[in-house]
Each structure stands twice: as C-alpha cells, then as structure tokens.
Regions:
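Flexible beta->alpha loop and helix N-cap segments adjacent to enzyme active/binding sites
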Residues: 2, 9-13, 17-40, 47-51, ...
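N-terminal phosphate-binding loop and adjacent alpha-helix
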Residues: 46-70, 278
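Short HxH-centered metal-ligating active-site micro-motif
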Residues: 56-67, 78-82, 509, 513, ...
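Phosphate/pyrophosphate-binding loops at sites that engage ATP/ADP/AMP, CoA/4′-phosphopantetheine
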Residues: 62-76, 118-122, 281-290
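Short beta-strand-loop/turn "lid" adjacent to the catalytic site in phosphate-handling enzymes
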Residues: 70-112, 139-140
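Short glycine-rich phosphate-binding loop at a beta-alpha junction
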Residues: 72-83, 128-129, 290-299, 400
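Short acidic-aromatic active-site loops that bind/stabilize oxyanions
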Residues: 104-105, 128-131, 256, 260-276, ...
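Phosphate/ATP-binding catalytic cores across multiple sugar-kinase/actin-like superfamilies
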Residues: 268-294
Length: 555
C-alpha cells in the first residue's frame, strides 16, 4: 500500500491572493509510506526555496512519486495533517476577508482540485483523508521510537483548535489520555514573550540560545504571574497578563539593536518557565501511568535545551524526540497513522536516520552540474575525499559538505552541512561572518564519533546514540577549552553522534579529522545562508558556495 502524507497550505506558489497566513499552515512537506516503511520524505522549502513554506507541497509530492517510480493514481490514500473541520474553518475565515473566493469552501474539494490540476488525472475523493493534528505528531514519534510502550507528549502552538496531547503508546496502538486547549498553548506562550526580544514566529530557537546569557531569577517573580502549576499535571497560562506586566519593565528590542541585559534575563526566565511546566506535566504522567519511556513531538519539542533537561532528569529510562518534530513531521505521522489503520505497521526498530530526501546523483551527474559552472568554479576528483577534507579542516578551512540523500527535518546531519574545526573559539565568529550573518551569541553544534561521545560530553547512563542533534548536553569540563567553537557560554552543546553503520562517509571524515587534529569531533552547521533553506541539490550547494565565503565545497 502506498500512502502519501501531506502538510502545508491549500494554495499553490503562484496563488497569492487567497493566501492563508503562514502561522496557520507552515512547514509544508510530503512523505511517501509503502507498507508501513518510509520511502521518501522532503519539505517543500527545500524545493521551492521558501523557508517554512506554507504552500501546498506539490513539488514534494512530485519528488516522492518520482523517487518511487509511482504515479498519482498508485496512491491508495492521501493523508492530510489536520482535521477537515479545522481546514474548512480556516477557509471560511479566509472567505470573510476574501469574499471573491469561489465556493464551495471545502478543504477536500480544494485539495482534490490542486492534485487533479497538477497531475491531470481523476482522483477518487474517498482517497483523501484528514488526520487529527496532534495525533499525527504523536504517531510520528511513537511509531518510530522502537519502544514497545511509552508515554507520548505532543506540544506545539496550535492545530485543530488544540495545543497538545498526552497519550500512551502500547505496541501498535496509541491511546489519548488528555488534550490541551489553545488557552494552554506553550508555543503561543513562548511566542508572546519573545516579541519583547525583537523576535517572532520561527525565531523561538534563537531565544533558546540566548537564554544562557541571562539570569532567570531576575524575572522569576514576574513569570509566576503568567502560569500556575496545578495538581495532577495540570497547569494554567495567563497570556493576557504578559504584555501589561512586561511593557513597563522591558524596552522592546527592534531588529538590529543589541541585546540588553534585560532581554537576556527575559530569555532565561522564559526558558526556565517552559522547562518547569513541561517537567511538571511529565512527572505526573510518569507516576500516574508507570510508563518508563517517553516520546516527544510538536514544535515545542524542538527546544533542545528542554529536551536535555528531560534526559538528565532521570524521569525516564529512554527519551525519543521526533527529529522532524515540527509540522513537516505531521506529514510523516499522518501517513503512518493511515497506513496503520489499513494494517500496515512500521517496524518496531528504532529510527536510525532521516536521509529520505533528494539524492545528489551519480558522479557523472554531479560532474555535469559542476561543468555548467565552469568559469566561476574549478573542480577536481579526489582519490580520498574524507582524508583530503579532514586535512583542509585541520588547516583551518571551512567547507561545504554534500553527499547522498538530504535530511528530512530542520537539522543538517552530515549530508548537507558546513563543517569546520571545533577547537578554535574564533571559528564561531568567523563562520557567522563568512556564511550565516546571524547573531553572534548563537552556538554551533558538534558531530562526534558515536563510540567516542562519552569522552567529550556528559552522556546520561543508558544513552548511547544521539543521531538527531536534538538534545543539549554538557561538554565535559576538561574538554570545554579544547572544543571552543562548539561549547556554548554555559558549557553545553547540541550533540550529534555519528554511526559508521548509518553514515559511513561522514564517519570516515570525522575519523580522518581525528587522526589529523586529535579530536573525534567536527563543528557542524546547516549548509545555508541566513536567507535560504538548507541546500538540497548540487546546484543549490554551488550557489550558496559562490555567495558565501566558504573555502571549499566537497560533493
């Protein structure tokens, strides 16, 4: 059975007049599942080059079909990442401001029209199904965790008029315990506060990096007015109090202005509040259900600092965070859920990688692309790519590294990465100036040989693999000065372990770098500038290489 999961908006890239605001329909993606197994998955932004694309992911759908060698007629079910009721409500809301829109205001009718228009064939409307948003998040985590049983927490801004749920996963089933209304949205809570720091939607991860520079105690009493912890894992948010309480105390930062001590303290207090609320919920349901494993998904689960605190807390034996925890991951969850309902269950083996996107092609295909850029670039084949790249990095070079299929989700995990020596602290500012043009406080992540991670980082007992760069952990005290480029101001790093079995070419590069430089770690950041999404194709990589200050491009 072929099932196609879909997230994103209900309009094409050229249909701007009726666009639903991106905050409602972001991170468009398509995921193709065959008999419970992921065949292909890609975010629309990688193909249309629009960050957090809210368009109907027609290019992603085309990619998935092409990769499988399938036709649209071969898809048994199209699984959309929200309920039909919610989608219809968004269309009706849009109609209030755009009465010239044609009727009927039916999400299924719109989706059917988009698919039939693009692929020029009739599609049975019964093949289009809608999935509860947070259940899609939850399934995306539990179904791929490898756990037989687990507590599951899905939390985000909002979707389907809710902001999260708690469930218990047991073997092939997922049983909901409680849902959180929009009034308890931790995503909205975070967003409402960061506007005082000069940030908005999709900037939440930046504040996570700013928080260690501040003192949470400065505003702790103020934040106590914004939320309260209740018995049995419940909590209340008082979002209406945020602006009146902070406006007299905080000067709202404008874009380009420096961060004041107030802004840093506010970020620290916000991060502390989020962690307190989530741990309060988890402590209760850990005790009430007896579940010893935890799965996390939803946009809030991309808060890697929070994830690290959960891992260190010892509440759970094992913690799995869906690497595509944002709404693109709902395309994955929706497809998995619908496949399961039709008797096709994923393997209970834990997820080891998310290299499900575009392949860069054969050596001949790569050479053909590079030949098209002659006059702007020169290139040659290397007899030992890993060794030569490692030697260049050890000598101070910053390289673009592109290989294999692209990653699904927001992290570059060794297939679409910018890499450098993790030792000189000056490399942080150098790469920011060269490529990223981003805030200087934001840390870079390390990729480390899986078998040596414990030499450099404080890895909780029982944890051996951290393949998705989604936990912030402590750098060992004696290694912090050595790893100056990847150690944050609070002595932490967002750790990515690399397995020889899962990504042999990247592992070989890090091993070669260890032989050159004495450390089995490299600095790894996503291969993009501060405007575009992560590169997907060789063509994308060449363009980014030419428009930044990278020293070398390795393909």
């Amino acid at each position: 059975m072929l099932c196609l999961g879909i997230s994103g908006g209900l309009n094409l890239i050229h249909e701007n007049p009726y666009e639903i605001p991106k905050v409602f329909t972001h991170d468009g993606a398509a995921v193709l599942i065959e008999d419970g197994k992921v065949v292909a998955a890609i975010e629309e932004e990688r193909l249309n080059r629009i960050k957090h694309s809210n368009k109907f992911p027609i290019r992603s759908i085309g990619f998935c079909l092409d990769h499988r060698g399938a036709r649209i007629q071969d898809i048994e079910r199209f699984a959309f990442y929200a309920t039909e009721e919610y989608c219809n409500a968004l269309l009706s809301r849009l109609y209030l401001t755009r009465p010239e829109m044609k009727k009927p205001l039916s999400a299924k009718a719109v989706m059917l029209e988009l698919l039939q228009q693009e692929f020029q064939c009739d599609i049975d409307p019964e093949r289009i199904v809608f999935v509860r948003h947070h259940m899609a998040h939850a399934v995306s985590a539990f179904a791929l965790s490898g756990f037989e049983r687990s507590l599951v927490l899905a939390i985000d801004g909002y979707g389907d008029f809710l902001s999260g749920l708690v469930a218990i996963g047991e073997e092939q089933s997922l049983n909901q315990i409680v849902t959180f209304p929009q009034s308890k949205s931790l995503g909205v809570f975070y967003l409402d506060v960061i506007q005082f720091i000069g940030y908005g939607s999709f900037d939440e991860y930046k504040v996570m990096g700013l928080a260690p520079y501040g003192n949470a105690e400065v505003y702790r009493s103020v934040f106590s007015e914004f939320y309260e912890l209740k018995p049995e894992g419940d909590y209340a948010l008082h979002l209406d109090r945020i602006v009146p309480a902070l406006l007299p105390k905080i000067e709202i930062r404008k874009k380009g202005q420096p961060f004041s001590p107030q802004h840093k303290d506010l970020a620290a207090a916000l991060q502390q509040a989020l962690e307190r609320i989530v741990l309060h919920v988890l402590r209760h349901y850990r005790q009430a259900t007896g579940q010893r494993n935890l799965c996390l998904a939803g946009g809030v689960a991309h808060n890697c600092t929070m994830n690290g605190k959960i891992l260190y807390s010892g509440l759970f034996d094992q913690v799995f965070v869906q690497p595509a925890a944002h709404d693109a991951g709902c395309a994955l969850g929706a497809a998995l859920l619908v496949s399961q309902e039709r008797g096709h269950y994923p393997s209970r083996q834990p997820l080891t990688h998310v290299y499900w996107g575009s392949d860069i092609g054969t050596p001949a295909e790569i050479a053909a692309v590079l030949n098209g850029w002659r006059g702007l670039i020169s290139f040659r084949r290397s007899p030992d790519v890993a060794r030569e790249a490692a030697t260049l990095m050890a000598a101070g070079a910053v390289i673009g590294w592109v290989q294999g299929r692209s990653e699904f989700g927001p992290r570059a995990l060794g297939n679409r990465s910018i890499l450098a020596d993790p030792r000189p602290a000056a490399n942080k500012e150098r790469i920011n100036r060269m490529v990223k043009k981003r805030e200087g406080y934001r840390p870079f992540a390390p990729s480390v040989l899986e078998e040596e991670a414990g030499e450099y980082f404080e890895i909780p007992e029982g944890t051996t693999k951290l393949p998705f760069m989604i936990f912030v952990l402590k750098v060992k005290q004696e290694k912090r000065e050595l790893l100056g480029a990847i150690t944050h101001v609070d002595g932490t790093a967002r750790v990515h372990t690399v397995s020889k079995e899962t990504n042999p070419r990247y592992w070989e590069l890090i091993k070669a770098f260890e032989e050159e430089a004495g450390v089995g770690v490299v600095l790894n950041t996503s291969f993009n500038n501060n405007v575009e999404p992560i590169v997907d194709s060789v063509e994308d990589a060449v363009v980014t290489y030419l428009t930044t200050g990278l020293d070398y491009l390795v393909v």
